[in-house]
Amino acid sequence: VRTERRLFVVDGPKGLEAALETPGRVREVFVTPAAAERYAALLDVLASTAPDVPVHRVDGPAMEALSEAVTPAGVVAVCTPLDVPLADLLAPRPRLLALCADVRDPGNAGTVVRCADAAGADGVALLGNAVDLHNPKTVRASVGSVFHLPIATETDVAGAVAAVRAVGVRVLAADGGGRLDLFEAEASGLLAEPTAWLLGNEAWGLPDEVAALADDVVSIPIHGRAESLNLATAAALCLYASARAQRAPGA
């Protein structure tokens, strides 16, 4: 469905609820009889806000074929694509972005989107050889956040970083070899400026040539014996540090 018709499937009631916030996003819904009873209030919202969207009753085996969840919730929605052009993401002069370079794991990508949404970021960009934004695991891991903020996809990492810098947003690469650590960056006032965090692949982080595209490189201090932090945790720390700095009195 994703490749042939530029449509994708959203699993579960939370995803459907979030998708309904954008008029025209939901094209059709499939639901089992049991789920129709369990989520009757949500289906009432669907009927009132999008009365032209067809709702198909299906049995358990059909739902298992439609859903990629281990335990299907019994309701899936077919939706229109999410991604926007990078130029549209940058047009409003964003103050906080997450740039994910070559992030391949759909669960991590979805969780970064969720973290960005929670931190009040203005958008996310999936760069390079990144996971498909519409992968069901990406959508599910975001818990609806893919519908809450603009998300761009761009294969040209260098071009995307240059475009972000061109609109006055400072690009900070999150990497263990950073010149500053996160606390020093915040104390210096650096994070109060419009910022895009450049985050690397789960397995090998940011290659030197990609980190070199950023205005500066910032590390997250590790005080214990852990070798590193996973991508989503690092993203949450960086994004929330920027959100705190940007929302401080007088910022």
Stretches with model-predicted labels:
Residues 1, 57, 90-99, 213-222:
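Glycine/charged-rich beta-loop-alpha catalytic/anionic-binding loops adjacent to active sites
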Residues 1-70:
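N-terminal positively charged helical leader segments and presequences
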Residues 6, 100-104, 219-227:
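Short pre-catalytic strand/loop immediately N-terminal to key active-site residues, enriched for Gly-Thr
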Residues 13, 34-36, 62, 82, ...:
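Short glycine-rich anion-binding loops that position phosphate/pyrophosphate groups of nucleotides
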Residues 14, 21, 61, 79, ...:
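RNA substrate-binding interface of SAM-dependent RNA methyltransferases
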Residues 77, 115-119, 133-146, 208-251:
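Structured adenosyl-cofactor binding patch, chiefly the S-adenosyl-L-methionine
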Residues 172-226:
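Active-site/ligand-binding-proximal alpha/beta "capping" segment
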